[in-house]
Amino acid sequence: MGRIAALTRNPVMIALVAMLAIAGCASKKTPNNAADLGLNGAGAATPGSAQDFTVNIGDRIFFDTDSSSIRADAQTTLARQAQWLNQYKQYAIVVEGHADERGTREYNLALGARRAAAARDFLVSKGVASSRLKTISYGKERPVAVCDDISCWSQNRRAVTTLSGAGS
């Protein structure tokens, strides 16, 4: 009891306790609309910007296990990408191929290369100039989700279309 009495007589401790009590009572402002998030409304990225591409078009597609075949949902995304890329021709494009953590490094690099090539070929089939496109495989080296679970693995089986040049 002597310690507590000594602490309550210390002005620094009293001030510290008071500040903690006040801070604990303060309400936290949480963003509740797009303006608070700095987006100025959904999809408010400047048309033709790299942010516009990522936010409004979608920069990635996903693959089934051990596959480089373009799924129906991925075809929709790639078709939107091609339309956007054909409208905004100032960008150079790199298609990154990725794989999940299962398999050897060599196998996943080759699988990532096939995925990037499949996405590139689809974009070319929709009119995007092949001279603007490059591919790279990261295999399993750059996961977006890390855990030993199918939900993580499925997020890592992807191709990502990245833009460079023109103020991206």
Swiss-Prot record:
Signal peptide positions (record): 1-24
Lipidation (S-diacylglycerol cysteine): 25
Entries under PROSITE patterns matching the protein: OMPA_1, OMPA_2, PROKAR_LIPOPROTEIN
BP GO annotations: cell division
Main location: membrane
All residue ranges annotated as the OmpA-like domain in the record: 50-167
InterPro entries assigned: Bact_OuterMem_StrucFunc (IPR050330), OMP_bac (IPR006664), OmpA-like (IPR006665), OMPA-like_CS (IPR006690), OmpA-like_sf (IPR036737), Pal (IPR039001), Pal_lipo_C (IPR014169)
Pfam families: OmpA (PF00691)
Topology versus the membrane: Lipid-anchor
Subcellular location(s) of the protein: Cell outer membrane
Keywords from the named record: Cell cycle, Cell division, Cell outer membrane, Lipoprotein, Membrane, Palmitate, Signal
GO cellular component, one term: cell outer membrane
Lipid-bearing positions (N-palmitoyl cysteine): 25
UniProt similarity note: Belongs to the Pal lipoprotein family.
Oligomeric form and interacting partners: The Tol-Pal system is composed of five core proteins: the inner membrane proteins TolA, TolQ and TolR, the periplasmic protein TolB and the outer membrane protein Pal. They form a network linking the inner and outer membranes and the peptidoglycan layer.
Function summary: Part of the Tol-Pal system, which plays a role in outer membrane invagination during cell division and is important for maintaining outer membrane integrity.
Protein name: Peptidoglycan-associated lipoprotein
